[in-house]
Amino acid sequence: MNTFGDNFRVTTWGESHGKALGAVIDGCPSNLPISEEDIQNELNRRRPGYSIFSTPRKEEDKLEILSGIFEGKTTGTPISGLVFNKGQKSKDYSKIKNTPRPGHADLNYFLKYGNYDYRGGGRSSGRTTIGNVIGGAVAKKLIEFTHNIKIIGYSTKIGKINGDFDYYKNPEFFESNSNIEKLFEKIENNPLRCPSKNSDEMKDYVLDAMDKQDSVGGIIEIIIKGIPQGVGNPVFNKLEGKLGSAFIGINAVKGFEIGRGFESSELYGSEMNDSYYMNKDSIKGKTNNTGGIIGGISTGSPVVLRVSIKPTPSISKIQESVNLISNENEKIEIGGRHDPIIVPRVIPVLESMAAITVADLMISSGYIDPCRI
């Protein structure tokens, strides 16, 4: 329920307004060089206050490592890390504790469990992805250290506005690690984490939604470069199946596609098929329309993934709901501090889950020694 992975396992815990949140990572081999700073850097990318489009909730998200790392290297024992909540304002939710918020998991949690933490959504809050990022930071370090695998994410669409940058517009760009490093810098210096030339138009779109007390969603593209051929399995533990499960498990994700995705339904087979050719002593694909995965197994080409993110459900507009005590219809006005768009902050979470998935399957596929590096 709260654990992802079979060999490289990440268990997350904590609630939005609880004392702390964190993760336990089990199955990471020993001797992996890693520091608190490596993990903190990833947490900083997810932290509130990233940009003008982020929630004004003030949180340091300062990491504390409790176990599993000694003298700058993993020990092979469970790695435990936590972050203390410091900026929660639970009184913001006291007026609506009996009125489930539309678009949130409040009502479903109440109907299923009877008792739920209404403060900021409790366990269903996006803040709980702190644990995902802690685990993902370790996984990123593991797959990059052992196989130089790079994972990068960016927004390609904000609301109804399409960007002009994505993998299929220039796949050759992603052949260079230097290009990827430059792209990362560009993304991190953009408030929407969007490398497109028309990102200013996207910013105006979000600002307009904010003026209307509304919110905006978008589409994120994730590229996994350097993953070797043979990662994944043919039937139930398919690489794309595991990635889909990892991504759909993240709050706000409502759609997932690989490679050409839904566009492939419009193509002829002759357009979709990736022809092969000999490149010295190896077989390569002339194109990568399948997104780096065929038959549940990585092809060696970059894995190309896209995810649809819904608009942030917490908006300032008055909405319709019900009172769980009186069983009567009721208007609800949500206070508190919320993101007008969650897309930029979801990107490091998606990268983290991609890294955890790849690390897990690379161990089971024999590419990483489960005991020590």
UniProtKB/Swiss-Prot annotation:
Question: Residues that bind NADP(+), according to the entry?
Answer: 46
Residue spans making up a coiled coil are none
Cofactor binding notes: Reduced FMN (FMNH(2)).
**Binding annotation for FMN:** 123-125, 251-252, 295, 310-314, 337
Keyword ATP-binding attributed: no
Give GO terms: molecular function aspect only. chorismate synthase activity; FMN binding
E.C. numbers: 4.2.3.5
Q: Its catalytic activity?
A: 5-O-(1-carboxyvinyl)-3-phosphoshikimate = chorismate + phosphate
Q: Which cofactor does it need?
A: FMNH2
Family indicated by similarity: Belongs to the chorismate synthase family.
Instruction: Name it.
Output: Chorismate synthase
